[in-house]
Regions:
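Short, small-residue-biased leader/transition segments that mark boundaries at the very start
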Residues: 3-11
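Short, acidic, small-residue-rich periplasmic hinge/interaction motif at the N-terminus
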Residues: 7-8, 34-41, 50-96, 134
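Short, acidic Ser/Thr/Gly-rich low-complexity loop/linker segments typical of extracellular
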Residues: 10-21
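Short acidic/polar hinge/loop motifs at secondary-structure boundaries
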Residues: 23-25, 126, 145-173, 192
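Extracytoplasmic beta-strand/coil segments of soluble accessory domains associated
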Residues: 104-145, 161, 167
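A beta-strand signature from Gram-negative outer-membrane beta-barrel systems
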Residues: 160-205
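Transmembrane beta-barrel wall of Gram-negative outer-membrane proteins
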Residues: 201, 208-239, 244-282, 333-337, ...
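Acidic/polar loop-and-plug regions of large Gram-negative outer-membrane beta-barrel proteins
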Residues: 259, 267-334, 361-419
């Protein structure tokens, strides 16, 4: 292995050959040498002899902080070395800048990335990368693809709690070599979570923000024991009223990682995380024209008219309602194994399962005619940028009680209806990648990506 060698507290002055051999001329009989190698702890050695000195074999200890299994499995690109347009966000940056924003919004300052909250509800953010929608962006957590196997995209509300367990987040913009069969024409996003690298300790925190935003979080980690075991636990709850009118939300998130460093060549880890949540929404189909937004100023008082939700109202029992509503829970469990075969070759394998259960509601509008069974494309809140005023109270809220009364009085079934789209799926996958080096400039990758 090539080590970096320097005088203590000085710039590097020598690099060893591939076998670790080096010759160094010193101007003083006393010196402190410092040895560095990626993935190992730095080591210092004092030299006080004159003449030629053979230091023998110098052994470096593994450093769990920089040689985590998920980093190798996820294939993080190296700045100024990997030939791709890449941006890496450290956990300190995420913690400092994220605040009460949605997780994808942390990428707003990344070149070529456009992030928006869409309707403005919890977890409804979306990302475009170099003009491509999420269906053409590969999103991975610890190297495991998260994109839906049918339509290619993903819903960030299912992973809203990832911001609390992210060790680093990296975006690669544009086409590039990929180890997974996920759509990545626009680029890829790789999220690496906490693992064996965590220091021993824990914390409890509470945060609050505008519009009833609350977040309670706890985290504890054992650090790596002398036997090579490490355990990290995290749990939390986020709830609030939402910035947009009628977008209340409540979400839990949990994370568990159990890791074992068997020896210098083998390491295994088990990871489980999820974020069960529900949130009311403002449909992106309820957007108004500029004239329409100005017309709702009277409904919002001193608040911005753009916070108005055309389908916000109250049910027959006084409960808050919105035509669009989402509830979902999609936990993921994975078992990772990292095998460092030799100095040039490695094999990383991940087996995973993800189980999704939930649904979403949406308003479907009027029937076509008295004898029809289908509903025309007229949404509850608005139609073609114009606010629906047929079922509107004087304060601007949507009159759900009038719809209940109308449907109850109808002799031909419900005149206005809401649909519930149910999504239940079980994902199973196996991802294995073999890597080896041929000389200093050629890397070979091969493997399998199985998903069912």
């Amino acid at each position: 292995r090539r080590y970096t060698l320097s005088l203590h507290d000085a710039l590097p002055i020598s690099v060893t050959d591939i076998d670790g051999n080096f010759v160094l001329k010193l101007t003083s009989s006393k010196a402190t040498l410092e040895f560095k190698y990626l993935g190992y702890q730095d080591k210092t050695m004092k030299v006080t002899q004159k003449g030629n000195v053979d230091l023998g074999t110098i052994a470096l200890s593994l450093d769990a902080k920089t040689l985590g299994d998920v980093v190798i499995t996820s294939s993080i690109a190296v700045a100024r070395k990997t030939p791709v347009a890449v941006t890496t966000l450290a956990p300190e940056f995420i913690e400092e800048k994220l605040g009460t924003q949605e997780f994808p919004e942390i990428l707003k300052s990344t070149p070529g990335v456009y992030a928006t909250k869409q309707g403005g509800a919890y977890g409804d953010s979306k990302i475009n990368m170099r003009g491509f929608k999420s269906e053409n962006i590969a999103v991975m957590v610890n190297g495991i693809p998260m994109n839906d196997m049918e339509w290619g995209g993903l819903y960030w509300s299912n992973w809203a709690g990832l911001s609390d367990v992210t060790r680093s987040m990296q975006t690669q913009r544009g086409l590039g070599a990929s180890k997974v069969s996920a759509p990545s024409v626009g680029g890829s996003i790789n999220i690496v979570t906490r693992t064996i690298d965590q220091k021993k300790g824990g914390s409890i925190s509470y945060a609050m923000g505008n519009d009833g935003y609350n977040k309670l979080l706890f985290h504890v980690s054992t650090g790596m024991s002398k036997d090579g075991w490490a355990l990290t636990l995290l749990g939390g709850k986020t709830w609030g009223d939402g910035y947009i009118q009628g977008t209340e939300f409540s979400a839990y998130n949990y994370f568990v990682n159990i890791a074992k460093r068997i020896n210098d060549a083998h390491q295994i880890s088990f990871t489980a995380f999820g974020s069960p949540q529900w949130h009311n929404q403002r449909s992106n189909k309820d957007g108004l024209s500029i004239k329409g937004w100005q017309a709702v100023k009277n409904y919002m008082g001193d608040k911005s008219p753009y916070r108005y939700n055309p389908t916000y109202g109250f049910g027959p029992n006084g409960e808050r309602m919105s035509a669009s509503h989402n509830e979902y829970h999609k936990p993921q469990l994975s078992l990772n194994h990292q095998w460092q075969i030799n100095e040039k070759s490695s094999l990383s394998t991940a087996a995973y399962v993800s189980i999704g259960r939930g649904y979403g509601n949406a308003g479907q509008g009027y029937k076509k005619d008295a004898n029809g069974t289908t509903y025309r494309n007229m949404w509850y809140g608005s139609y073609k940028g114009n606010l629906n005023t047929y079922f509107r109270n004087s304060d601007g809220t949507f009159a759900y009680d009038q719809i209940y009364d109308m449907n109850e009085a109808s002799d031909n079934g419900s005149m206005m209806a809401m649909s519930k789209s149910i999504n239940e799926h079980n994902w199973y996958g196996l991802l294995s990648t073999y890597t080896t080096k041929f000389g200093d400039y050629i890397d070979f990758y091969g493997g399998i990506d199985f998903r069912y």
